[in-house]
Amino acid sequence: MTEILINGNFLCRNLTGIERFAWEICKRIDSLLNSSDRVSMLVPANASNIPSYAHIAVVRSDKEIHGFSAWDLGVFAKACRSRNACALSFSNTAPFGKTCGIAFIHDVYAKVFPNDFKSLYDKLIGAYSRLNYYNICKNARLICTVSNFSKKQIMDYYGVAEEKIRVIYNGFEHIHTVNADESILEKIELRGRKFYFTLGSLSLRKNLQWIMKHAELYPNELFVISGAMLKNVVPSELEKIKLLKNIILAGYLSDGEVKTLMQNCKAFVFPSYFEGFGIPPLEALACGAPIIVSNAASLPEIYGSCAHYIDPFKPNVDLEALLAEPVSSPVPLFEKYSFDNSAKKLYEILKEIGR
């Protein structure tokens, strides 16, 4: 088998959906490997939390990662060439040209909504993202993505042949390994109170505006928002949110704190207008919470009849009435969207490419 070299850049990033996917899939791929498989991972020198694998060979680089271009186009690309290995990249980035290998594009957000990138810094991030989409679509041996919605967008925007793209779904199993941390209920004074919960990095597509405008219209409803602040959230919006007494900005929370809020909320609200998959509502369902999600992008494909739907641009919605409407059991979703199943699918791809 040709060596597969995994891009360990995700080990130096905050744990959002893309990084979660990489962590969970690599852990399960490791359990599927046998002695004839050659799979390694190149890890930056400044990665602090390095996984322990039984079969994936962890190669520690002496170079740190401080910019994706320097790592992906330099250190990682050079390692792929010197080892004659096929690259496997999970994070929407990959080496340029013939060393691109197998690469994941989780979504093409920067291509579809370029105007969401407001500041000069964000415009550079958007341009770099689009450059990576183009490189992967042109040069990858195989493209993986996380929904049929994203697959179609890759085909439509970049003219990629359908047979060059494989859909490998996200999963939810990790939430069951997390110990709930109920101290968060006292920390932000939620014990005994009814509230809606939303989770996600506070980028424009997560649609913080919907929550803000809805909270203004329904002052008796309480919302808890968790997520790290990003540069492309308009500061004036955040200042206005801080003035609303029925919104709690909880900041970045631990997995245990998030699990507790999912277990105790009236519903998990996810008004994002663009998602390649959207893991948080699946986590919430696994915690027993009803979910209210946007009717846009991949979300109807992923959640089907198991979710309550809202228009991401119309915040005047009676959520109590919406929650009274019947939805289907989420059990079929747990059977369909599984990291275990997705790892098996990716392993078959690696064997196919590595022959």
Positions of PLM-derived features:
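Carbohydrate transferase catalytic cores enriched for Leloir-type hexosyltransferases
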Residues: 1-355
